[in-house]
Amino acid sequence: MTSSDFYLRDTCRLCENNKLERVIELTPTPPGNYVLRADEVEEPRPSYPLEVYFCNDCAHVQLGHVVDPRILFQRRYTYVSSTSPVFVAHLREYASAMIKRFSLGKGRLIADIGSNDGTCLRFFQEHGFEVLGIDPATDIARTASDRGIETIPDFFGFKKAQYLRKERGPATLITSHNVLAHIDDLSDIIKGVEHWLDDDGLFIMEVGYLVDVYQKVWFDTIYHEHLDYHTLTPLLGFLGRHGLEVIEVE
């Protein structure tokens, strides 16, 4: 572990206020979702601070220390969406429900931020939509593309959105599943979403819910990938400040 591998953020990711209070301090740990080979088990692994902070201005809960995302997501990232039958069934139902709920017209562009192996986009593709994934996990993105789900192996942000809108046109729907808890610069992501969307476009995101973490004692969800633990009120304020109107919450 070197100081260049991580840093301590001193402002809230949602409201950018500096009124942060540390509320949980766990033992420093190595990053999760990194499976070791047999010959690596005895080798020392870098550990990083794991501390949860509360924003006394907007009430958002978040990690303070940010590990370089290239360490977390581009070096042997192992989580693959299609390995969970429950999640696959959820995404299949989700795609059908969103098409029906919002009367999405076939042939238009649907993009998924953090698309993983393309499981979600595959179900939209089966309904006749053009699809495009963006995911920084290079090996997984390549697997998705090999399976017919075009996937850009990169991080998403405003600059990437400018390029994609120019090259591919506006998106009618942008989705993200359990991704916005993983991103340090949330403003850059949302600016990118707002720029890439068509005038009548939709952004649908799924995020973990802090209330569940608290009530069900899901302490194991606190690790370096999960920078944010969302609740509705702070998130509504954040999205509104970026020009997005929230029309439905489940």
Regions found by a protein language model. Give the residues of each.
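Short, glycine-/aromatic-enriched active-site segment of Class I SAM-dependent methyltransferases
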Residues: P31-Y34, F203-D228, L232-P234
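Conserved SAM-binding strand-loop segment of SAM-dependent methyltransferases
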Residues: G148-Y163
